[in-house]
Amino acid sequence: MDKTQRDLIIVSPYFVPGDEFTGYLVSLVDRGVRVRILTNSLQANDVSMVHAGYMRYRKDLVAGGVELFEFKADANKVVRKENRESGAETKEKRRIGASKASLHAKFFSFDETYLFIGSFNLDGRSVALNSELGAYYASPEEAKLLSQEFDEMILQIAYQLTLDESGDLQWTTERNGEELVFFKEPDTTWWKRFSTGFLSIIV
């Protein structure tokens, strides 16, 4: 990542950057690198403990200029709708979808030129405990297409986190062509928010 000059995309289902890596990502932005991150939203995350560990870093990332996105739990519905309208959907694709989705893809893209794809999550367990595999290779055409599709599709399948005038987080997305803004974790119960918030204090 140190050699990244223009653009960095991180897609990781479990994303717990820690203080040091959060500061590092913000430093990339400070030197002119566009940083985009996609991870699971609270509703889409199947491990509340991971989300609890991640949520404390969101404000610092967003305030530092990182473009932070959280995957919607109903993203599969959006993708299937797009496929139907474009005529691209097949019976096989229809069987793959589910009413509740969770992000599982794991990859990094550097300067729209290099890709890293593998089993590695950006959380403490992957870094310190798990044995992970990945492939790093140059593919400018694939990396550029990925970057373009990220921008084109992201607000349909994810929420973008920003800060409101009071410095609190807000979640922006598109639904049926309209922009929607949420001021708490979207599509979650008060208990889910409370319990995960409590976990964030102790993890």
Each model region followed by its residue ranges:
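PLD/PLD-like phosphodiesterase catalytic module centered on the HKD motif
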Residues: F15-V203
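Short catalytic-loop micro-motif centered on adjacent basic/acidic residues
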Residues: L8-S12
